[in-house]
A protein has these predicted regions:
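Short amphipathic helix-loop junctions that connect adjacent transmembrane helices
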Residues: 58-74
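C-terminal membrane-cytosol helix-exit motif in multi-pass small-molecule transporters
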Residues: 1-16, 211-215
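A late C-terminal transmembrane helix in Major Facilitator Superfamily
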Residues: 143, 153-192, 200-201
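Pair of pore-lining "gating" transmembrane helices in MFS-fold secondary transporters
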Residues: 35-55, 139-140
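Juxtamembrane intracellular "pre-TM" segments in multi-pass secondary transporters
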Residues: 11-43
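Helix-to-loop junctions at the C-terminal end of transmembrane segments
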Residues: 89-103, 190
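C-terminal transmembrane helical hairpin of 12-TM major facilitator-type secondary transporters
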Residues: 104-151
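Intrinsic disorder in cytosolic terminal tails and internal cytosolic loops
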Residues: 103, 215-233
Length: 233
């Protein structure tokens, strides 16, 4: 059904070429991607947050049931709150993108993720907190994901209209690797304490905020935005 919908409604604007060997084309696309500092900035803002939310997904059941004593049924409802937070974030982002620039929205996302992560860092330091405080910050982190990742993707791909497909694949692959690494690390270090349950999410969020503050060094100057026509061959 999805393939039929794409064939029926999606108009291809790019003319494919087979003048270059696929392997060389992939290598040249990697070089092109990492030659743009704006794309590197966008990549960092995209690939780091999954390490945080995948880490809490990996240990949330154990934390909720073992540490806080909720039942499995209650955990299902609690976990659903994180998913609802993403949905709400997506809805809010849909309204915000018509009123603010991508960089402003990335700044908003960085600020919100810092607010959540700073509190999680305090919780990790104390190694004790009421459940509502922990899960509120987890949901705030997830709410921010919907704003941060979508706008960072636009920033990362804007300088690369001719290799946008390969560029998005590069980002997606690295994102999955980092997310899986966060989940594996969380599973390894989890020892039944609140500290080790939230420390990765807290660290990643603080790192994302630092990267945003370092944007003038990572990608100095105004962000590049190409008109749609450049993507049409």
């Amino acid at each position: 059904l999805m393939i039929f919908g794409i064939r029926a409604n999606l108009v291809e604007t790019h003319v494919p070429t087979n003048t270059e060997h696929p392997a060389r084309q992939l290598v040249s696309s990697f070089r092109e991607f990492f030659s743009h500092r704006q794309s590197i900035f966008g990549l960092l803002m995209i690939v780091l947050p999954p390490a945080g939310f995948m880490s809490i997904i990996a240990v949330s059941a154990a934390m909720t049931v073992e540490i806080y004593g909720f039942s499995i049924k209650q955990y299902g409802l609690i976990f659903a709150c994180a998913g609802i937070a993403i949905l709400i974030g997506s809805t809010v982002n849909r309204w915000l993108v018509t009123r603010f620039s991508q960089l402003q929205l990335i700044g908003l996302g960085a600020g919100l993720i810092f607010a959540a992560s700073a509190q999680l860092a305090v919780i990790a330091y104390l190694d004790s907190a009421p459940f509502w405080w922990v899960w509120f910050n987890v949901c705030l982190f997830m709410f921010t994901i919907a704003i941060l990742l979508s706008n960072s993707m636009v920033v990362a791909l804007d300088p690369l209209p001719r290799i946008a497909g390969v560029a998005s694949s590069i980002i997606g692959t690295i994102q999955n690797l980092v997310g899986a690494s966060g989940a594996l690390l969380a599973a390894v270090i989890y020892d039944g304490t609140i500290r080790n349950a939230v420390i990765i999410m807290a660290t990643v969020g603080l790192l994302v905020a630092c990267i945003f503050l370092l944007r003038p060094l990572i990608a100095p100057g105004d962000l590049v935005h190409h008109p749609d026509e450049l993507a049409r061959d």
